[in-house]
């Protein structure tokens, strides 16, 4: 008897990809058009009210995020008219399919990854990371609320808007082992990493490179959570929990190792 064996699937596989450069350039331009003006508007307001914002940097960050979220939602509203087939996942997940637990667990793992990647020299030397965070009660509350809200802002823009748009304009899928996401998610993960380019100007080179790498990987995970749950809620939770817990850990170390 002859036994037929199916050919092994390659470990990395691209399927149905129709790559076109102009949608990727459009996504990069749209990313900056959403992020930069909103941030500069918040900066202008902060300059006008310098007496308050100089002592409450978290409020400036939060204000910029509010403006960026509103800009992202406005672009999604336009996209729904221009590209009605584009998925935005701006919905509550179906009951039992929200991946809330995995989102929380992934957020904790991401916080640990960022803490080590960003601050490993200080951690090894038992020297407090100088994150510059205000550790007064109001400062702690402000920073944690703002960081926990980062997922609402960035997932709306990067996964809801940009992945949704490119899913239609650059269709296809990419699979690595059992990890399977739309090709648009891979493209936007690259853009998500590039959005952190300012770290090359203000941080040591090793830290900037680490931030690029983990931002790219996190971007892939956020897309996976979004597609599996059919909602932005799980990636928003993972993103916000990761950012908030890393900042909380840095604040604890600032106090424990006597940096004010």
Residue ranges of predicted features:
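Helix-boundary and loop/linker segments of multi-pass membrane transporters
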Residues: 13-18, 91-96, 130-140, 174-179
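Alpha-helical transmembrane segments in multi-pass membrane proteins
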Residues: 21-82, 102, 129-133, 137, ...
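Short, Lys/Arg-rich, polar N-terminal cytosolic tail immediately upstream
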Residues: 1-17
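Residue-level signature of transmembrane alpha-helical cores of multipass secondary-active transporters
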Residues: 28, 103, 107, 143, ...
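Structural signal for membrane-spanning alpha-helices in multi-pass inner-membrane proteins
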Residues: 35, 39, 75-80, 114, ...
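Transmembrane helix-loop-helix hairpins at the membrane interface
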Residues: 118-119, 139-260
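Juxtamembrane "helix-exit" motif on the non-cytosolic side of transmembrane helices
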Residues: 38-49, 117-124, 197-203
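Membrane-water interface of transmembrane alpha-helices
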Residues: 71-84, 156-167
């Amino acid at each position: 008897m002859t036994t037929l064996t199916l050919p092994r699937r390659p470990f990395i596989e691209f399927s149905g990809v129709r790559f076109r450069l102009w949608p990727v350039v459009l996504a990069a331009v749209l990313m900056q058009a959403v992020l930069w003006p909103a941030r500069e508007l918040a900066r202008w307001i902060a300059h006008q009210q310098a007496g308050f914002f100089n002592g409450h940097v978290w409020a400036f960050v939060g204000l910029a995020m509010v403006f960026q979220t509103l800009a992202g939602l406005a672009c999604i509203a336009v996209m729904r008219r221009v590209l009605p087939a584009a998925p935005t996942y701006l919905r509550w997940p179906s009951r039992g399919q929200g991946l809330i637990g995995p989102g929380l667990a992934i957020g904790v793992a991401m916080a640990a990854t960022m803490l080590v990647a960003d601050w490993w020299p200080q951690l090894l030397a038992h020297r407090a990371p100088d994150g510059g965070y205000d550790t007064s009660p109001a400062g702690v509350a402000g920073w944690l609320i703002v960081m926990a809200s980062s997922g609402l802002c960035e997932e709306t823009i990067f996964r809801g808007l940009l992945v949704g748009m490119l899913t239609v304009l650059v269709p296809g899928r990419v699979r690595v082992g059992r990890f399977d996401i739309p090709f648009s998610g891979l493209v936007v993960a690259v853009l998500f990493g590039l959005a952190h380019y300012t770290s090359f100007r203000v941080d040591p080179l090793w830290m900037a490179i680490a931030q690029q790498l983990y931002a790219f990987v996190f971007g892939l995970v956020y897309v996976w959570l979004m597609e599996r749950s059919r909602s932005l809620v799980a990636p928003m939770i993972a993103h916000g929990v990761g950012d908030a817990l890393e900042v909380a850990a840095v604040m604890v170390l600032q106090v424990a190792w006597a940096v004010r």
